[in-house]
Amino acid sequence: MQPNDITFFQRFQDDIMAGRKTITIRDESESHFKTGDVLRVGRFEDDGYFCTIEVTATSTVTLDTLTEKHAEQENMTLTELIKVIADIYPGQTQFYVIEFKCL
């Protein structure tokens, strides 16, 4: 069995599969992904594989520069997005946006 390259919380699986979530915002530990990378995707909770994605773009962002567009790409409101990112990465301000599409 191949290992997964990236994981998402299970609550995001349906949005990813339906194309409603098209970016992920990560910290420096996952800043190495590049445009064109093809990644196996698993659930964070059990590492179960659920799809393959292709990275279509990467960029950097801070909590202060998150926009409504980022929130739309995450399928949530900007307020929700800022809270989710702050909860997952407490005390951090610099992040890496990974845009993707399901294959």
Swiss-Prot record:
Domain spans labelled ASCH: 6-101
Catalytic reactions of this protein: N(4)-acetylcytidine + H2O = cytidine + acetate + H(+); N(4)-acetyl-2'-deoxycytidine + H2O = 2'-deoxycytidine + acetate + H(+); N(4)-acetylcytosine + H2O = cytosine + acetate + H(+)
EC number: 3.5.1.135
Active site (catalytic residues): 21 (proton acceptor), 24 (nucleophile), 74 (proton donor)
GO CC annotations, alphabetized: cytosol
GO MF annotations, alphabetized: hydrolase activity, acting on carbon-nitrogen (but not peptide) bonds, in linear amidines; N4-acetylcytidine amidohydrolase activity
Keyword set, alphabetical order: Hydrolase
CDD domains for this protein: ASCH_yqfb_like (cd06552)
Role: Catalyzes the hydrolysis of N(4)-acetylcytidine (ac4C).
Family statement: Belongs to the N(4)-acetylcytidine amidohydrolase family.
Alphabetized HAMAP family for the sequence: ac4C_amidohydr (MF_00684)
Name recorded for this polypeptide: N(4)-acetylcytidine amidohydrolase
Native organism: Shigella boydii serotype 18 (strain CDC 3083-94 / BS512)
The gene coding this protein: yqfB
